[in-house]
Amino acid sequence: MRTLALALLVVGSTALFAQTPALPPIKLALVEGLSGGNANGGEAVFRNLVWAVERVNERGGVATPAGARKLALARYDNKGQTEEALSALRAAIDDDAQVILQGNSSSVAAALIDAINKHNERDAAKRVVFLNYSAVDPILTNEKCSPWHFRFDAHADMRMTALMDVLKDDKAVKSIYIIGQDYSFGHAVA
C-alpha cells in the first residue's frame, strides 16, 4: 500500500509540475514584392520584420487571454503584381495565417482589402487582419475603409498638407515642382 501511495504521489507531482503545452503561434504573412523590381524594398521589410518578431518572441511572445503566444513569420512573393498578391493571400490563408502584412504598393493594398473583406465575410472562423505599414493612397482609408485594414503611416494627403504647411512659411522657396508617378500615389500627391 505504501508503494502504491508513493507511486501515486510521484505521478501526481509530476503532472502538477509538467509544463502546459505551448499555444500555437500567431502566424504573420508578409505578402510583398520579394523578386523583380520591388525585391530590394520587400527584402528590407522582411529583414525588419524578422528582427521585430525575434524581439517579441525573446520577450515571451504576445499576451493573449489564453496565454502568451509566439509569432511566426512567413513570406509570400507577390512579385509587385496585384494578381500575384491575391494568389499569395490565398496561399497564406490556406497556411492558416492570421495577420497579413503588406505596404509597398497602394494598388496591391486596395486589392488585398477587397479580397480580405470577401474572405472574412465568407469564412468567419478564419478571419484575417491586414496590417498596412506604408501604402499611402488615401482611398485605402476613405472609400475602401475596412475594419480589417489598419494603416500605420500617414496617407499622401496628410503628408502633402504637412509639407505645404512648412513650405508656405519658408520665404526662401519660390517655386515647387512635382514629378509624380503615373499611378495612385503620384495622382494623390499631384
Language-model features, listed with the residues they occupy:
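Extracytoplasmic "Venus flytrap"
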Residues: 23, 29-52, 77-82, 105, ...
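Extended hydrophobic secondary-structure segments that form protein cores and membrane-embedded regions
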Residues: 70-78, 129-133
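Signal peptide-proximal N-terminal region
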Residues: 20-23, 47-73
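Short, low-complexity disordered leader/linker segments with a strong preference
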Residues: 1-27, 94
